[in-house]
Amino acid sequence: MASKSHDLTHGPLVQQIILFSLPLMATNVLQVLFNMSDVAVVGQFAGPEALGSVGSTSILVSLFTGFLIGMGSGVNVVVARYIGARHDQDVHEAVHTSLILSLIVGVIIMALGFLFTPAMLSMLGTKPVLMAGAVSYLRIYCLGMPAMAVFNFGNAVLSAAGDTKKPLYFLSMAGVINILLNLFFVIVCHLAAAGVALASIISQYISAALVILSLRRSGSVVRLERSMLRIEPHKAKQVLSLSIPAGLQNAIFAIANLFIQAGVNSFDEVMVEGNAAAANADALVYDVMAAIYTACSSFMSQNYGAGKRKRIIHSYFISMAFSFGIALVMSALLVIFGRQFLSIFTNVEEVAQAGMIRLRIMGCSYAFSAFMDCTIAANRGLGKSFVPTVIVIMGSCVFRIIWVYTVFAYFHTIESLYLLYIVSWAITAAAEMICLRRVYREQMQKLPPDIDGVKAAA
Protein backbone atom coordinates (compact mmCIF):
# COMPACT_ATOMS: atom_id res chain seq x y z
CA MET A 1 0.00 0.00 0.00
CA ALA A 2 1.42 3.38 -0.94
CA SER A 3 1.66 5.83 1.88
CA LYS A 4 -0.92 8.65 1.71
CA SER A 5 0.21 10.34 4.89
CA HIS A 6 1.19 14.00 4.94
CA ASP A 7 4.82 14.56 4.00
CA LEU A 8 6.73 16.55 6.61
CA THR A 9 10.08 16.15 4.82
CA HIS A 10 9.56 18.73 2.05
CA GLY A 11 8.36 22.31 1.86
CA PRO A 12 8.73 25.51 3.92
CA LEU A 13 9.17 24.56 7.57
CA VAL A 14 7.66 27.62 9.25
CA GLN A 15 4.43 27.32 7.30
CA GLN A 16 4.29 23.55 7.74
CA ILE A 17 4.87 23.67 11.49
CA ILE A 18 2.19 26.34 11.90
CA LEU A 19 -0.35 24.41 9.83
CA PHE A 20 0.53 21.20 11.66
CA SER A 21 0.36 22.79 15.11
CA LEU A 22 -2.80 24.90 14.87
CA PRO A 23 -5.32 22.01 14.76
CA LEU A 24 -3.33 20.21 17.46
CA MET A 25 -3.28 23.39 19.52
CA ALA A 26 -7.03 23.75 19.12
CA THR A 27 -7.44 20.11 20.13
CA ASN A 28 -5.37 20.61 23.26
CA VAL A 29 -7.14 23.85 24.17
CA LEU A 30 -10.53 22.21 23.74
CA GLN A 31 -9.40 19.33 25.92
CA VAL A 32 -8.33 21.78 28.63
CA LEU A 33 -11.55 23.78 28.31
CA PHE A 34 -13.66 20.66 28.57
CA ASN A 35 -11.67 19.60 31.63
CA MET A 36 -12.14 23.09 33.01
CA SER A 37 -15.86 22.68 32.54
CA ASP A 38 -15.71 19.94 35.17
CA VAL A 39 -14.17 22.36 37.65
CA ALA A 40 -16.34 25.30 36.59
CA VAL A 41 -19.62 23.39 36.84
CA VAL A 42 -18.66 21.95 40.23
CA GLY A 43 -17.45 25.31 41.54
CA GLN A 44 -20.51 27.23 40.38
CA PHE A 45 -23.28 24.69 41.08
CA ALA A 46 -21.94 22.32 43.75
CA GLY A 47 -19.99 24.72 45.96
CA PRO A 48 -16.41 25.19 47.21
CA GLU A 49 -16.30 21.83 49.01
CA ALA A 50 -16.94 19.90 45.79
CA LEU A 51 -14.45 22.18 44.00
CA GLY A 52 -11.82 21.34 46.60
CA SER A 53 -12.58 17.61 46.22
CA VAL A 54 -11.97 17.71 42.48
CA GLY A 55 -8.91 19.93 42.89
CA SER A 56 -7.41 17.56 45.45
CA THR A 57 -7.27 14.83 42.80
CA SER A 58 -5.52 16.94 40.14
CA ILE A 59 -2.03 15.63 40.85
CA LEU A 60 -3.16 12.01 40.76
CA VAL A 61 -5.10 12.59 37.55
CA SER A 62 -1.91 14.09 36.09
CA LEU A 63 0.01 11.03 37.27
CA PHE A 64 -2.27 8.64 35.37
CA THR A 65 -2.91 10.71 32.27
CA GLY A 66 0.73 11.81 32.08
CA PHE A 67 1.90 8.24 31.69
CA LEU A 68 -0.61 7.65 28.88
CA ILE A 69 0.46 10.85 27.13
CA GLY A 70 4.05 9.62 27.37
CA MET A 71 2.99 6.36 25.75
CA GLY A 72 1.49 8.36 22.91
CA SER A 73 4.66 10.37 22.36
CA GLY A 74 6.68 7.19 21.95
CA VAL A 75 4.17 5.85 19.43
CA ASN A 76 4.32 9.15 17.55
CA VAL A 77 8.11 9.09 17.15
CA VAL A 78 8.34 5.45 16.01
CA VAL A 79 5.49 5.72 13.49
CA ALA A 80 6.72 9.08 12.15
CA ARG A 81 10.23 7.76 11.58
CA TYR A 82 8.99 4.79 9.54
CA ILE A 83 6.69 7.06 7.55
CA GLY A 84 9.62 9.36 6.78
CA ALA A 85 11.71 6.38 5.68
CA ARG A 86 8.82 5.10 3.47
CA HIS A 87 8.84 1.71 5.25
CA ASP A 88 5.12 0.96 5.01
CA GLN A 89 5.25 -2.56 6.44
CA ASP A 90 7.09 -1.27 9.49
CA VAL A 91 4.43 1.43 9.88
CA HIS A 92 1.68 -1.23 9.84
CA GLU A 93 3.44 -3.31 12.48
CA ALA A 94 4.20 -0.31 14.70
CA VAL A 95 0.61 0.95 14.57
CA HIS A 96 -1.04 -2.37 15.43
CA THR A 97 1.51 -3.23 18.10
CA SER A 98 1.06 0.20 19.68
CA LEU A 99 -2.72 -0.14 19.89
CA ILE A 100 -2.47 -3.36 21.88
CA LEU A 101 0.26 -2.00 24.16
CA SER A 102 -1.69 1.21 24.82
CA LEU A 103 -4.85 -0.68 25.70
CA ILE A 104 -2.96 -2.98 28.09
CA VAL A 105 -1.36 -0.02 29.85
CA GLY A 106 -4.72 1.75 30.11
CA VAL A 107 -6.34 -1.27 31.78
CA ILE A 108 -3.45 -1.60 34.24
CA ILE A 109 -3.64 2.08 35.23
CA MET A 110 -7.41 1.81 35.62
CA ALA A 111 -7.10 -1.14 38.00
CA LEU A 112 -4.28 0.35 40.09
CA GLY A 113 -5.94 3.75 40.30
CA PHE A 114 -9.30 2.34 41.35
CA LEU A 115 -7.81 0.11 44.04
CA PHE A 116 -5.39 2.58 45.61
CA THR A 117 -7.35 5.84 45.38
CA PRO A 118 -8.10 6.17 49.14
CA ALA A 119 -4.51 5.40 50.13
CA MET A 120 -3.04 7.89 47.65
CA LEU A 121 -5.41 10.66 48.69
CA SER A 122 -4.60 10.03 52.34
CA MET A 123 -0.89 10.19 51.55
CA LEU A 124 -1.48 13.63 50.03
CA GLY A 125 -3.04 14.84 53.26
CA THR A 126 -6.42 15.49 51.65
CA LYS A 127 -8.72 17.34 54.06
CA PRO A 128 -11.27 14.99 55.72
CA VAL A 129 -14.12 17.21 54.56
CA LEU A 130 -12.98 16.74 50.94
CA MET A 131 -12.10 13.03 51.09
CA ALA A 132 -15.44 11.42 50.20
CA GLY A 133 -15.95 13.57 47.11
CA ALA A 134 -12.34 13.14 46.01
CA VAL A 135 -12.48 9.33 46.30
CA SER A 136 -15.74 9.18 44.37
CA TYR A 137 -14.44 11.47 41.61
CA LEU A 138 -11.10 9.74 41.13
CA ARG A 139 -12.44 6.18 41.16
CA ILE A 140 -15.01 6.97 38.50
CA TYR A 141 -12.43 8.91 36.47
CA CYS A 142 -10.07 5.91 36.52
CA LEU A 143 -12.68 3.83 34.70
CA GLY A 144 -11.97 5.95 31.62
CA MET A 145 -8.24 5.20 31.47
CA PRO A 146 -8.50 2.50 28.72
CA ALA A 147 -10.44 4.93 26.53
CA MET A 148 -7.93 7.70 27.17
CA ALA A 149 -5.09 5.33 26.26
CA VAL A 150 -6.77 4.44 22.97
CA PHE A 151 -7.48 8.08 22.08
CA ASN A 152 -3.87 9.10 22.84
CA PHE A 153 -2.70 6.22 20.64
CA GLY A 154 -4.90 7.35 17.76
CA ASN A 155 -3.93 10.98 18.21
CA ALA A 156 -0.24 10.01 18.15
CA VAL A 157 -0.61 7.91 14.99
CA LEU A 158 -2.60 10.55 13.12
CA SER A 159 -0.12 13.26 14.16
CA ALA A 160 2.80 11.11 13.02
CA ALA A 161 1.09 10.88 9.64
CA GLY A 162 0.68 14.67 9.57
CA ASP A 163 -3.07 14.66 10.21
CA THR A 164 -3.87 16.85 13.22
CA LYS A 165 -7.40 17.81 12.15
CA LYS A 166 -9.29 14.58 12.81
CA PRO A 167 -8.45 14.50 16.55
CA LEU A 168 -9.78 18.06 16.74
CA TYR A 169 -13.09 17.03 15.21
CA PHE A 170 -13.42 13.98 17.45
CA LEU A 171 -12.59 15.88 20.62
CA SER A 172 -15.01 18.66 19.72
CA MET A 173 -17.88 16.20 19.43
CA ALA A 174 -17.00 14.37 22.63
CA GLY A 175 -16.34 17.62 24.49
CA VAL A 176 -19.73 19.13 23.75
CA ILE A 177 -21.31 15.93 25.06
CA ASN A 178 -19.08 16.22 28.14
CA ILE A 179 -20.30 19.73 28.95
CA LEU A 180 -23.96 18.82 28.50
CA LEU A 181 -23.55 15.76 30.71
CA ASN A 182 -21.70 17.85 33.32
CA LEU A 183 -24.67 20.17 33.60
CA PHE A 184 -27.16 17.30 33.64
CA PHE A 185 -25.40 15.19 36.26
CA VAL A 186 -24.55 18.13 38.58
CA ILE A 187 -27.61 20.39 38.28
CA VAL A 188 -30.36 17.87 37.57
CA CYS A 189 -29.03 14.72 39.27
CA HIS A 190 -27.14 16.53 42.08
CA LEU A 191 -24.15 14.16 41.76
CA ALA A 192 -21.54 16.90 42.42
CA ALA A 193 -17.96 15.63 41.89
CA ALA A 194 -19.09 12.14 40.90
CA GLY A 195 -21.30 13.63 38.19
CA VAL A 196 -18.49 15.42 36.36
CA ALA A 197 -16.32 12.30 36.57
CA LEU A 198 -19.09 10.25 35.01
CA ALA A 199 -19.51 12.81 32.23
CA SER A 200 -15.76 12.71 31.58
CA ILE A 201 -15.49 8.96 31.11
CA ILE A 202 -18.52 8.83 28.80
CA SER A 203 -16.95 11.48 26.56
CA GLN A 204 -13.60 9.68 26.68
CA TYR A 205 -15.10 6.46 25.37
CA ILE A 206 -16.87 8.39 22.62
CA SER A 207 -13.61 10.02 21.48
CA ALA A 208 -11.80 6.66 21.60
CA ALA A 209 -14.50 5.03 19.46
CA LEU A 210 -14.30 7.85 16.92
CA VAL A 211 -10.52 7.66 16.53
CA ILE A 212 -10.58 3.87 16.10
CA LEU A 213 -13.36 4.15 13.52
CA SER A 214 -11.32 6.76 11.64
CA LEU A 215 -8.21 4.56 11.54
CA ARG A 216 -10.30 1.59 10.44
CA ARG A 217 -11.64 3.58 7.49
CA SER A 218 -8.36 5.30 6.65
CA GLY A 219 -6.95 4.87 3.17
CA SER A 220 -3.43 5.73 4.32
CA VAL A 221 -0.52 3.68 5.55
CA VAL A 222 -1.77 3.95 9.17
CA ARG A 223 -5.01 2.07 8.47
CA LEU A 224 -6.09 -0.34 11.24
CA GLU A 225 -6.88 -3.88 10.12
CA ARG A 226 -8.22 -6.53 12.47
CA SER A 227 -6.13 -9.26 10.82
CA MET A 228 -2.91 -7.40 11.71
CA LEU A 229 -3.68 -6.92 15.41
CA ARG A 230 -0.72 -8.57 17.06
CA ILE A 231 2.34 -7.56 19.04
CA GLU A 232 5.46 -7.58 16.87
CA PRO A 233 8.35 -7.96 19.37
CA HIS A 234 10.85 -5.65 17.67
CA LYS A 235 8.30 -2.86 17.23
CA ALA A 236 7.10 -3.35 20.80
CA LYS A 237 10.66 -2.90 22.03
CA GLN A 238 11.07 0.28 19.97
CA VAL A 239 7.80 1.77 21.16
CA LEU A 240 8.33 0.86 24.81
CA SER A 241 11.94 2.10 24.80
CA LEU A 242 10.61 5.57 24.01
CA SER A 243 7.18 5.39 25.64
CA ILE A 244 8.13 4.09 29.07
CA PRO A 245 10.78 6.77 29.76
CA ALA A 246 8.41 9.44 28.42
CA GLY A 247 5.54 8.07 30.49
CA LEU A 248 7.72 7.79 33.57
CA GLN A 249 8.92 11.34 33.03
CA ASN A 250 5.35 12.62 33.09
CA ALA A 251 4.38 10.33 35.95
CA ILE A 252 7.42 11.27 38.04
CA PHE A 253 6.63 14.93 37.47
CA ALA A 254 3.23 14.17 38.94
CA ILE A 255 4.83 12.28 41.84
CA ALA A 256 7.06 15.27 42.59
CA ASN A 257 3.97 17.44 42.40
CA LEU A 258 2.38 15.21 45.04
CA PHE A 259 4.85 16.73 47.49
CA ILE A 260 3.91 20.19 46.23
CA GLN A 261 0.22 19.39 46.71
CA ALA A 262 1.00 18.16 50.21
CA GLY A 263 2.65 21.52 50.83
CA VAL A 264 -0.45 23.33 49.55
CA ASN A 265 -2.62 21.13 51.76
CA SER A 266 -0.68 22.37 54.79
CA PHE A 267 -2.48 25.71 54.38
CA ASP A 268 -6.17 26.38 54.98
CA GLU A 269 -9.04 25.31 52.73
CA VAL A 270 -9.19 28.72 51.02
CA MET A 271 -5.60 28.35 49.80
CA VAL A 272 -6.26 24.76 48.67
CA GLU A 273 -9.33 25.86 46.70
CA GLY A 274 -7.54 28.90 45.24
CA ASN A 275 -4.64 26.72 44.13
CA ALA A 276 -7.08 24.26 42.53
CA ALA A 277 -8.74 27.05 40.55
CA ALA A 278 -5.49 28.71 39.44
CA ALA A 279 -3.86 25.40 38.50
CA ASN A 280 -6.24 25.24 35.55
CA ALA A 281 -4.06 27.90 33.94
CA ASP A 282 -1.12 25.48 33.99
CA ALA A 283 -3.02 22.96 31.91
CA LEU A 284 -4.13 25.65 29.47
CA VAL A 285 -0.62 27.03 28.88
CA TYR A 286 1.13 23.66 28.85
CA ASP A 287 -1.29 22.08 26.42
CA VAL A 288 -1.10 24.96 23.95
CA MET A 289 2.69 24.70 24.04
CA ALA A 290 2.50 20.90 23.86
CA ALA A 291 1.18 21.22 20.30
CA ILE A 292 4.52 22.74 19.34
CA TYR A 293 6.40 19.99 21.16
CA THR A 294 4.46 17.34 19.24
CA ALA A 295 5.27 19.18 16.02
CA CYS A 296 8.93 19.28 17.01
CA SER A 297 9.19 15.53 17.65
CA SER A 298 7.05 14.61 14.60
CA PHE A 299 9.01 16.79 12.17
CA MET A 300 12.37 15.78 13.58
CA SER A 301 11.46 12.09 13.55
CA GLN A 302 10.09 12.04 9.99
CA ASN A 303 13.07 14.00 8.71
CA TYR A 304 15.48 11.79 10.63
CA GLY A 305 13.90 8.78 8.94
CA ALA A 306 14.29 10.55 5.59
CA GLY A 307 17.90 11.58 6.31
CA LYS A 308 17.18 15.34 6.10
CA ARG A 309 19.72 16.62 8.61
CA LYS A 310 19.20 20.35 7.98
CA ARG A 311 15.44 20.09 8.37
CA ILE A 312 15.98 18.25 11.65
CA ILE A 313 17.83 21.05 13.43
CA HIS A 314 15.76 23.80 11.81
CA SER A 315 12.59 22.09 13.05
CA TYR A 316 13.96 22.33 16.59
CA PHE A 317 14.84 26.02 16.46
CA ILE A 318 11.56 27.02 14.82
CA SER A 319 9.59 25.02 17.38
CA MET A 320 11.58 26.56 20.22
CA ALA A 321 10.85 30.09 18.99
CA PHE A 322 7.13 29.39 18.66
CA SER A 323 6.77 27.76 22.08
CA PHE A 324 8.72 30.54 23.82
CA GLY A 325 6.61 33.23 22.15
CA ILE A 326 3.37 31.47 23.05
CA ALA A 327 4.48 31.20 26.68
CA LEU A 328 5.23 34.93 26.89
CA VAL A 329 1.89 35.97 25.39
CA MET A 330 -0.23 33.59 27.47
CA SER A 331 1.63 34.48 30.66
CA ALA A 332 0.95 38.17 30.13
CA LEU A 333 -2.74 37.54 29.45
CA LEU A 334 -3.13 35.41 32.57
CA VAL A 335 -1.46 37.98 34.81
CA ILE A 336 -3.51 40.86 33.38
CA PHE A 337 -6.85 39.04 33.25
CA GLY A 338 -6.29 36.65 36.14
CA ARG A 339 -9.34 37.71 38.14
CA GLN A 340 -11.63 37.20 35.17
CA PHE A 341 -10.07 33.78 34.56
CA LEU A 342 -10.56 32.70 38.16
CA SER A 343 -14.17 33.88 38.16
CA ILE A 344 -14.92 30.94 35.86
CA PHE A 345 -14.20 28.55 38.71
CA THR A 346 -15.19 30.38 41.87
CA ASN A 347 -17.31 33.30 43.03
CA VAL A 348 -15.68 33.43 46.48
CA GLU A 349 -13.42 36.49 46.77
CA GLU A 350 -10.97 34.93 49.24
CA VAL A 351 -10.47 31.92 46.95
CA ALA A 352 -9.82 34.21 43.97
CA GLN A 353 -7.24 36.18 45.97
CA ALA A 354 -5.44 32.96 46.85
CA GLY A 355 -5.52 31.89 43.20
CA MET A 356 -3.96 35.16 42.03
CA ILE A 357 -0.84 34.46 44.09
CA ARG A 358 -0.20 31.37 41.98
CA LEU A 359 -1.08 33.07 38.68
CA ARG A 360 1.37 35.94 39.24
CA ILE A 361 4.30 33.67 40.07
CA MET A 362 3.57 31.09 37.37
CA GLY A 363 3.11 33.87 34.82
CA CYS A 364 6.82 34.62 35.24
CA SER A 365 7.74 30.94 34.93
CA TYR A 366 6.06 29.41 31.87
CA ALA A 367 8.62 30.66 29.33
CA PHE A 368 11.36 28.64 31.04
CA SER A 369 9.38 25.45 30.53
CA ALA A 370 9.47 26.05 26.74
CA PHE A 371 13.25 25.59 26.68
CA MET A 372 13.00 22.41 28.72
CA ASP A 373 10.06 20.68 27.06
CA CYS A 374 10.91 21.56 23.46
CA THR A 375 14.42 20.20 23.96
CA ILE A 376 13.05 17.01 25.51
CA ALA A 377 10.78 16.61 22.46
CA ALA A 378 13.78 17.11 20.18
CA ASN A 379 15.79 14.42 21.96
CA ARG A 380 12.82 12.07 21.70
CA GLY A 381 12.37 12.88 18.02
CA LEU A 382 15.94 11.74 17.47
CA GLY A 383 15.14 8.46 19.20
CA LYS A 384 16.70 9.21 22.58
CA SER A 385 14.46 9.13 25.62
CA PHE A 386 16.30 7.48 28.52
CA VAL A 387 18.98 10.08 29.33
CA PRO A 388 16.60 13.06 28.89
CA THR A 389 14.23 11.32 31.28
CA VAL A 390 16.98 10.86 33.87
CA ILE A 391 17.81 14.56 33.56
CA VAL A 392 14.18 15.49 34.15
CA ILE A 393 13.95 13.17 37.15
CA MET A 394 16.99 14.79 38.76
CA GLY A 395 16.48 18.40 37.69
CA SER A 396 12.74 18.83 38.01
CA CYS A 397 11.55 16.00 40.24
CA VAL A 398 14.21 15.19 42.84
CA PHE A 399 15.11 18.87 42.99
CA ARG A 400 11.48 19.81 43.71
CA ILE A 401 11.23 17.32 46.55
CA ILE A 402 14.46 18.66 48.05
CA TRP A 403 13.10 22.21 47.71
CA VAL A 404 9.88 21.31 49.53
CA TYR A 405 11.80 19.86 52.48
CA THR A 406 14.40 22.63 52.64
CA VAL A 407 13.45 26.04 51.21
CA PHE A 408 9.69 25.66 51.68
CA ALA A 409 10.09 24.02 55.09
CA TYR A 410 12.21 26.97 56.21
CA PHE A 411 9.97 29.81 54.94
CA HIS A 412 6.62 27.98 54.84
CA THR A 413 4.97 30.56 52.60
CA ILE A 414 2.94 29.74 49.52
CA GLU A 415 5.25 31.98 47.47
CA SER A 416 8.31 29.95 48.47
CA LEU A 417 6.48 26.81 47.33
CA TYR A 418 5.49 28.16 43.90
CA LEU A 419 8.98 29.53 43.17
CA LEU A 420 10.37 26.01 42.84
CA TYR A 421 8.79 25.78 39.36
CA ILE A 422 10.88 28.48 37.72
CA VAL A 423 14.10 27.32 39.39
CA SER A 424 13.64 23.65 38.49
CA TRP A 425 12.66 24.44 34.89
CA ALA A 426 15.72 26.63 34.37
CA ILE A 427 18.11 23.99 35.73
CA THR A 428 16.54 21.17 33.72
CA ALA A 429 16.41 23.20 30.50
CA ALA A 430 20.14 23.89 30.65
CA ALA A 431 20.97 20.22 31.20
CA GLU A 432 18.60 19.07 28.41
CA MET A 433 20.23 21.44 25.92
CA ILE A 434 23.65 20.05 26.72
CA CYS A 435 22.26 16.55 26.21
CA LEU A 436 20.66 17.48 22.86
CA ARG A 437 23.94 18.86 21.53
CA ARG A 438 25.59 15.51 22.14
CA VAL A 439 22.64 13.46 20.85
CA TYR A 440 22.41 15.54 17.67
CA ARG A 441 26.09 15.04 16.87
CA GLU A 442 25.86 11.29 17.47
CA GLN A 443 22.71 10.82 15.40
CA MET A 444 23.93 12.97 12.50
CA GLN A 445 26.98 10.74 12.14
CA LYS A 446 24.60 7.91 11.21
CA LEU A 447 23.07 9.88 8.31
CA PRO A 448 24.38 10.54 4.80
CA PRO A 449 25.11 14.15 3.79
CA ASP A 450 21.93 16.22 3.38
CA ILE A 451 21.62 16.76 -0.35
CA ASP A 452 18.19 18.43 -0.38
CA GLY A 453 18.84 21.41 1.87
CA VAL A 454 15.99 23.21 3.60
CA LYS A 455 13.79 26.22 3.14
CA ALA A 456 13.29 27.54 6.64
CA ALA A 457 10.72 30.20 5.91
CA ALA A 458 7.38 30.33 4.19
Regions found by a protein language model. Give the residues of each.
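Short alpha-helical transmembrane segments in multi-pass integral membrane proteins
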Residues: 1-21, 79-146, 188-244, 300-365, ...
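N-terminal transmembrane alpha-helices
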Residues: 8-45, 59-74, 78, 103-110, ...
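Interfacial/gating helices of multi-pass transporter permease domains
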Residues: 42-62, 128-133, 193-194, 198, ...
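Hydrophobic transmembrane alpha-helices of multi-pass small-molecule transporters
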Residues: 63-66, 178-182, 208-212, 284-287, ...
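Short runs within selected transmembrane alpha-helices of multi-pass transporters and secretion channels
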Residues: 72, 141-159, 167-175, 196-209, ...
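Small-residue-rich hydrophobic transmembrane alpha-helices
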Residues: 51-111, 148-167, 261, 274-332, ...
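Transmembrane helical elements of multi-pass membrane transporters/channels
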Residues: 19-38, 140, 174, 203-207, ...
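Helix-terminus/linker motif at the lipid-water interface of multi-pass membrane proteins
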Residues: 29, 33-51, 121-128, 184-191, ...
